[in-house]
Amino acid sequence: MNNVLFVALGGSIGAVLRYLISLLMLQVFGSGFPFGTLVVNILGSFLMGVIFALGQVSELSPEIKAFIGVGMLGALTTFSTFSNESLLLMQEGELVKAVLNVVVNVGVCIFVVYLGQQLVFSRF
């Protein structure tokens, strides 16, 4: 039951971060492309790579893994919003933007998970 509290606390932080980052990206770039979702997915993927690698090279407590990996990063990143935004772009006739959104989200996020892991592995 203790881990549930860590997930909830991490989730509340991740959700607020996602909201604030999305607002900032909307102010900076406008609403023509879903940069907020892209940024939180890239950031969350990088941090997931770091957390995964830290778990490989050191002892991370189950509470830390629950707090950061499941709670904070689970709430920060968003596959459902990404999917909905991609579909909306297609429905609006913005096929190039929709494809770009899918390719960049998936490709960059996989790459930054790798970068996060390599950052940790190069230090240990």
From Swiss-Prot:
Na(+) binds at residues 74, 77. InterPro entries: FluC. GO terms for cellular component: plasma membrane. The chain crosses the membrane at residues 4-24, 35-55, 62-82, 95-115. It catalyses: fluoride(in) = fluoride(out). Keywords: Cell inner membrane, Cell membrane, Ion channel, Ion transport, Membrane, Metal-binding, Sodium, Transmembrane, Transmembrane helix, Transport. Na(+) is not transported, but it plays an essential structural role and its presence is essential for fluoride channel function. Fluoride-specific ion channel. Important for reducing fluoride concentration in the cell, thus reducing its toxicity. This is Fluoride-specific ion channel FluC. It comes from Shewanella halifaxensis (strain HAW-EB4).
